[in-house]
UniProtKB/Swiss-Prot annotation:
Gene source species: Saccharomyces cerevisiae (strain ATCC 204508 / S288c)
Function: Acts as an endogenous target of the ribosome quality control (RQC) pathway. During translation, the nascent chain has a propensity to stall ribosomes, thereby stimulating activation of the RQC pathway.
Protein name (Swiss-Prot/TrEMBL): Uncharacterized protein YEL057C
Domain of life: Eukaryota
Primary gene name: SDD1
Region of interest (The nascent chain stimulates ribosomal stalling during translation by interfering with the conformation of the peptidyl transferase center (PTC), and the translating mRNA by adopting a difficult-to-decode structure at the ribosome decoding center), residue spans: 196-212
Reported effect, Y201A: Decreases propensity to stall ribosomes
Amino acid sequence: MANDGIQRNDNRKGFKTVQFSAYSKEIDVIMKKISFLERNITQQLDTLPHFPKTLPPNHKDCVSRKHRARRGWSSQLKNLLGIYSKEEIFTLDNLAATLHDQVLKLQATLFPNAILKQVHLDNANIENKRILKEITYKYLSNENCKEENKFGTFIVKRIFFGDLSLGVSVLINRIAFESATSSIMVVRSSFIESDFFYEDYLIFDCRAKRRKKLKRKILFISTTMNFNYQTKV
């Protein structure tokens, strides 16, 4: 396997190697767009004096939430949308939709058709819900590692909706290059879960540093985004 690529075991004959060097310019452009959109959304939210504060959930809240009867999604959405004016929602929604498109474009660039799989949400299918909640791609580590130290590394994408049918989401799945050398490939994956912002650092050199926990970074409201998250490839 080439040192500047990563290899995926797809449980079939042979492997798929992705050479990242060929994508470096395009990835750089996309990441700049994503960073710009993130800053834009953050600035929009910072200008809202009535933006609700989000406190970390405690264990008691988590337990009681599990046993609490769910209200209809429409009443929840109505309460949340009442916080914002129509103009504010429209602005945030446009920014969020553009950001979402750029994230999909980045994923399609990093992981071609052979790796990305379309996920179709069927609310009656428990397995599909699980896949939507956490999509994991498994890769082999750098071939320079000793055989006994080889491990399967993961890029984990988690999408936190709270209620899958509710039109409220948090900023999802930013994947960026931290560094790339002939022997080390570092990929950062960010996601939000249970009101916390997580970053996973995956190092392709027999080492892995995972999950740096931060406070929630961004919340945006979208009335038009497709939360089935069907990846277009």
